Every structure is written in structure tokens, then in C-alpha cells.
């Protein structure tokens, strides 16, 4: 008789959905007020001039202008600012 033994079960095969984090607008780019600049977990980038920080640490533009990334302070933190055009 032709028999096929039952296949075993596995405990693998799951993965969480990607969260699409990262820099959405880069330095020198023009961004409108309310535009998302960085989606992040925690404060990898800190808000500078004319940049707001959301509840989930998303950085967004408070005014229209060009994006400027800078490293400053004694701890060499990365700041994102908007320079008005």
C-alpha cells in the first residue's frame, strides 16, 4: 500500500510586521509644516529649531523650510532643525 507519513508541525514561521522607521526627509530638502521628518523608536534624533516631537518620538516640521541635520552638545547628539526659506 502507498502510505505517506504525516508531516511534523513546526513552531517557527512568525515575524512581526516592519514598522517603516527611519529618516523620511533628508538634509537640504524642502519640507512643509506638519511634514514627517524622522520616524523613530526613542530619541535617536532630537528636535531642534522649528521641529516638534510626537508621542511616539516622531519628528515633524512646525514651519515650512529646509531641513538641517547637526551634531552638537557635549554628548554629540544629533539634532534636526528647520531653516526658514
Curated annotation (Swiss-Prot):
SUPFAM superfamilies noted in UniProt: Ribosomal L27 protein-like
MF GO annotations: structural constituent of ribosome
GO cellular component: cytosolic large ribosomal subunit
Keywords: Ribonucleoprotein, Ribosomal protein
Superkingdom of the source species: Bacteria
Pfam families cross-referenced by the UniProt entry: Ribosomal_L27
Range of residues in the leader sequence: none
One BP annotation, GO: translation
InterPro entries: Ribosomal_bL27 (IPR001684), Ribosomal_bL27_CS (IPR018261)
HAMAP family in UniProt: Ribosomal_bL27
Family, similarity comment: Belongs to the bacterial ribosomal protein bL27 family.
Name this polypeptide is given: Large ribosomal subunit protein bL27
Amino acid at each position: 500500500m502507498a502510505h505517506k507519513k504525516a508531516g511534523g508541525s513546526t513552531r517557527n514561521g512568525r515575524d512581526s510586521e516592519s514598522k517603516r522607521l527611519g529618516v523620511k526627509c533628508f538634509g537640504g530638502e524642502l519640507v512643509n509644516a506638519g511634514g514627517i521628518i524622522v520616524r523613530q523608536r526613542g530619541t535617536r534624533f532630537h528636535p531642534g529649531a522649528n521641529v516638534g516631537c510626537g508621542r511616539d518620538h516622531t519628528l515633524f516640521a512646525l514651519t515650512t523650510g529646509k531641513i538641517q541635520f547637526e551634531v552638537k552638545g557635549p554628548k554629540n547628539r544629533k539634532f534636526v532643525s528647520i531653516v526658514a526659506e
